[in-house]
Amino acid sequence: MAINATEKPLGKVFTPDYQLSIPSFQRAYIWKPENILQLISDLEEACKSPETPYFLGSLILVREGDTSFSVIDGQQRLVSLSIIIAALRDLEHDEEWMRLLDALIVEPGDKLRGITSQPRLTLRERDAAFFREYVQEGNLEALFDMNDEDCSSNAQRNIIANTKQAYDALAQLDEEERHRFASYLVNSVTLVIVTTDDLDGAHRIFDVMNMRGLPLTPSDVFKARAMSGLPAAAVDTYASRWDDIMDPLGDDAARVEEFFRYLHLILTHKPATGKLIEDFLSDVLNQYLAGHSIDAFIDGVLAPYAMAWRILERPSDTVLPDDVRGRLEALNDYRHHEWK
């Protein structure tokens, strides 16, 4: 396994040298407004000392081709940085600055050199077209007019909320301040780019280095482990299937963890030990992995129990009889939810 690590400013990452994509087995974009606003605030403070670089952690990439890479760690930051650059671009009045900022998030293409126009960063399949159309290609006005019903995933809702907040925060700066911010972002914000040609090796590196980003949730761990037990040809299909099942449960990590804790109890009749990830893997998921039947777990266990959980969580959204809905709504008013 060949590993290469090099430190680069952001302006040398968002270039034709790195065509980045988020694999389908990765978790969704989960940053909230407070996360992106904190990043903007940190960068505003840092750019007051332009001679001092701002280190934004590492990216772990798997090389898929000469300039094509899958992102194993760094998705949340890369998406958020793209949002910030898109907001800066749309706030800009100078055409040259607009062109330069736009080229950071969308490769403009070069027919002479055979370079096609495409986004620098491609999200997971379910969110890629949305992110490209509204953020990367500069349709922020249309994005700001959207509401939750216009979104097909929690990631898209997070993209809308974070883009609005980033735009409003950067709009508070005058033109000179935004130019100084953008210049610092491109030239002084640095990342350590760790590349390897081996997916398993990339995950081992991630396990060692994942200290800066948001911690993985149990659902993230279970999904990644489940995908590892599928044939390569089935990974994209079942990664999308997993997302279709879990996305309606929301992205509140505590509530999703509660779902898996109760699922573990139902399937094993064992009380919680406080080690959900370890227990669920050993008591439930590993049996399906050993039997090469992860598809049976996803279709026959995860899907129906997630549907039942949604009914218990939001009975008003169901077509259950009125008296049943009323009783479930009353039960949801209790502080303790062990009845589920």
Give the predicted meaning of each segment.
Residues M1-I72, Q76, H179-R180, L191-V192:
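Short alpha-helix boundary/capping and kink motifs at helix termini
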Residues I40, S82-I85, F206:
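Short, amphipathic alpha-helical segments that act as regulatory/interfacial helices
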Residues S49-E51, L91-E95, R212-L216:
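Secondary-structure transition/capping motifs at alpha-helix termini
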Residues R77-D94:
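Short active-site loop/helix that positions an aromatic residue
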Residues W97-N139:
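Extended charged low-complexity segments that act as oligomerization/scaffolding linkers
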Residues T122-K340:
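Polyanionic (Asp/Glu-rich) segments that form extended negatively charged tracts
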